[in-house]
A protein has these predicted regions:
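Alpha/beta-hydrolase fold catalytic core
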Residues: 1-57, 80-81, 121, 283-290
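Conserved loop-alpha-helix segment in the C-terminal half of the alpha/beta-hydrolase fold
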Residues: 75, 232-266
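Active-site loop/oxyanion-hole signature of alpha/beta-hydrolase fold enzymes
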Residues: 84-126
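Gly/Ala-rich beta-loop-alpha elbow adjacent to hydrolase catalytic centers
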Residues: 127, 131, 135
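Flexible "cap/lid" loop of the alpha/beta hydrolase fold
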Residues: 136-140, 147-176
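Hydrophobic, aromatic-rich cap/lid helix
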Residues: 194-222, 238
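Catalytic histidine-centered segment of alpha/beta-hydrolase-like enzymes
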Residues: 266-275, 279
Length: 290
């Protein structure tokens, strides 16, 4: 259906799900605890870990990704707090979109409905790249149920430029190379995703998925200033997505209460470039925890 992300055929979906389940079994560090949440825009797949509570870490991957992108973080984050890793609606994964997502308000709506369904009252949203954009859309358009947000090299803070698209295309090509060449390309491109053989296999299995999500519109200064919850902003020093120093400077001017950090030696794939730092920063930034 036009305007709805989906696989090109039922056969393509079945083939993808088979690979997805194998990769989940290979990578997920704890016994998977899946659940499906029905929203007004589709059914959202999520995975729970950790103790019960109304203050989960809710993990949102970037464009083209899903919950499995967080496999290196789940166990540590769930030591003493609930974790919910999400297959974002409209991205390639086990979630199933049923209605168009036309703008940021829609992107925030499905997430708000998920938070309500899981009983979250003080969720800590953790969004990488496009997942960061989605997290802020929830806070701006459907406020409530969120106590804090961590943005990991998020999209939406500057227009997408040629440098990013070159990085994306070269990364896609490098993902098809043998492991040894991929390691060299990962260093040259500042892209740790190229070291993730299983995730690359999953991405290749999703090549017949059609993504139909709204074009990314950068946040205005007024929107950033209007965010009503504590925010932590982690930026990759060498990110191909934007000029990280300029983004940090902009945020310092319009949202001075945000915690800002440009992480040396990392790129746009910060969530994988420095897993330990990202996990530690998320756990430490819990301003609403009782």
């Amino acid at each position: 259906m036009d305007g709805i992300s989906d696989f090109r055929s039922a056969t393509a979906r079945e083939a993808y799900v088979e690979v997805y389940d194998r990769v989940l079994a290979a990578l997920w560090p704890v016994p998977p605890c899946p659940a499906d949440v029905v929203t007004s825009l589709g059914t959202v797949r999520l995975y729970r870990h950790g103790p019960d509570g109304d203050d989960p870490f809710v993990l949102l991957s970037g464009a083209g990704g899903n919950a499995l992108a967080w496999y290196r973080h789940v166990a540590e984050l769930g030591v003493d707090r609930p974790v919910v890793a999400v297959d974002p609606l409209g991205e390639c994964g086990r979630s199933v979109q049923t209605a168009p997502i036309v703008d940021g308000a829609d992107a925030g709506r499905w997430l708000a409905e998920v938070l309500a369904a899981i009983g979250a009252e003080r969720a800590h949203l953790v969004g990488s790249s496009f997942g960061g954009w989605t997290a802020l859309q929830q806070v701006l358009h459907h406020p409530g149920r969120v106590g804090a947000v961590t943005l990991v090299d998020p999209a939406g803070f500057a227009p997408l430029g040629g440098r990013f698209y070159r990085w994306l295309v070269l990364g896609g090509m490098a993902g098809l190379l043998p492991a040894g060449l991929r390691r060299r390309a990962a260093r040259r491109l500042d892209n740790s995703t190229l070291l993730e053989t299983e995730l690359l296999r999953l991405g290749l299995a999703g090549r017949r998925f059609r993504r139909r999500l709204p074009s990314l519109v950068p946040f205005t200064d007024a929107e950033l200033a209007a965010v009503g919850v504590p925010v932590q902003l982690l930026l990759g020093e060498r990110s191909a997505l934007h000029d990280s120093a300029a983004v940090a400077q902009r945020v310092a001017g319009v949202a001075p209460g945000w915690r800002r950090e440009v992480v040396p030696g990392t790129g746009h794939a910060l969530v994988l470039d420095d897993v330990a730092l990202c996990t530690r920063r998320v756990r430490e930034f819990s301003p609403t925890r009782r």
